[in-house]
Regions:
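N-terminal glycine-rich dinucleotide-binding loop that anchors FAD/FMN and/or NAD(P) in oxidoreductases
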Residues: 1-2
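Short polybasic/polar patches that bind polyanions
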Residues: 14, 43-44
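Structured secondary-structure scaffolds
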Residues: 22-26, 30-41, 53, 57-61, ...
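A short, conserved structural fragment
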Residues: 47-49
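Metal-ion-coordinating, acidic/His-rich active-site neighborhoods
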Residues: 67-69
Length: 172
């Protein structure tokens, strides 16, 4: 299914005379191997842990949603789901992120977005769920430390910004 869309996008870009220097898919080895390296690095630092999570789950969107989203959104099927997953200790880096952004005013532009991010970071920051059990989601990058789980797409896709430019290879 995704392969079809990828071809459609490429054909559309060609018709619109849109060019790109590099086209990367998150299923490519140059991406998946770097994601596994990051996961192992974070796990070895103690920044990834296994815990149980319970929350509202949108079956159609294949993601957990907040109470507010459930009330305001148009979700076809929502259920309470309880499962074990791996989490990244994002809360551990909250103060460091705030300091970095304050010490480097040009780090986030425009300034309105910088203020928005700082406002977000000044509230309690929850740890980030970064996995899904294979029993529920079979596709994805397998966690290098637990074959029963895959990396959640919104974690691995963010790493695409650095894997696509050759981060942590001999090419940079």
């Amino acid at each position: 299914h995704v392969d079809e869309y990828m071809l459609r996008f490429k054909k559309t870009w060609e018709k619109l005379n849109i060019n790109y220097d590099d086209f990367i898919r998150t299923t490519e080895e140059r991406h998946t191997c770097r994601v596994k390296e990051v996961l192992l690095f974070l796990k070895d630092k103690g920044d990834i842990y296994l815990d149980e999570y319970e929350g509202l789950y949108s079956v159609s969107e294949e993601r957990f949603i907040t109470e507010r989203e459930s009330e305001e959104g148009d979700f076809k099927e929502v259920k309470v789901l309880k499962e074990k997953n791996y989490f990244f200790k994002m809360s551990k880096y909250q103060k460091e992120l705030i300091k970095h952004i304050n010490d480097n005013p040009d780090f986030i532009k425009p300034s309105s977005r910088r203020n928005e991010i700082l406002g977000f970071l000044k509230r309690d920051l929850n740890d980030l769920c970064i996995s899904r059990p294979k029993s529920r989601l079979s596709w994805g990058i397998e966690l290098p430390f637990d074959k029963d789980y895959v990396a959640y797409v919104w974690f691995d896709a963010l790493l695409n910004y650095i894997t696509s430019i050759g981060w942590n290879t001999n090419n940079n």
